[in-house]
């Protein structure tokens, strides 16, 4: 829990945790060169000499697939995908253990998304960095994730290994989400059951309903769902998965 830490107490954590932001156009200062942007974390934390910082910037640009000549250029001279690579290089500057990637490809063209996703996967594999990848794109999530946490109104409703979750969702909201993923089925195949359309409107997160937050739209709602909020628990026989649903016997 770091939300209660003071600015001074949080400083050591910032070296271990970094972020890649959704908007590659708004997350880079137009007045700073790429070198200044990538070097900023090193400057803030006083890492290395001026020469060592220049060397580190060149290394980081190479890691994310940008040439050394990019260092003296400005953000407006790059494409969206290249700008996001700059943002990733900045996040890597302090050798973090954990990176929050907040919708890092949603603002990019589809043709560029795969390049950035492959870069993130390579960094995760080669550098051993843990990524918290936030996205609403289920195809992207399936491509990059080892474990998936499904949230509804700011609450986790299911957490499972990626393959297990896509193969057999247990929470009704997860089931509805995955039913919206297009599937190619061979003639005569019974794989998939069509899209599950939820009724009603999404409640306000500021004033969520009592009990399970999903109960006003759940097609399998029970009386207990309207008054008692379920907690995340592992269903019987599935120790690698947790579900917050009374259907799975996960009441308090």
What are these regions (language model features)?
Residues 93-97:
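A short, proline-enriched helix->beta-strand linker immediately N-terminal to the Walker B motif
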Residues 161-252:
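Charged, flexible cofactor/metal-binding loops and thiol motifs
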Residues 100-190:
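P-loop NTP-binding/switch modules centered on Walker-like glycine-rich loops
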Residues 2-18, 44, 50-51, 164-169, ...:
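ABC ATPase NBD coupling module
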Residues 25, 31-44, 54, 58, ...:
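Short helical segment in ABC ATPase nucleotide-binding domains corresponding to the A-loop/adjacent helical element
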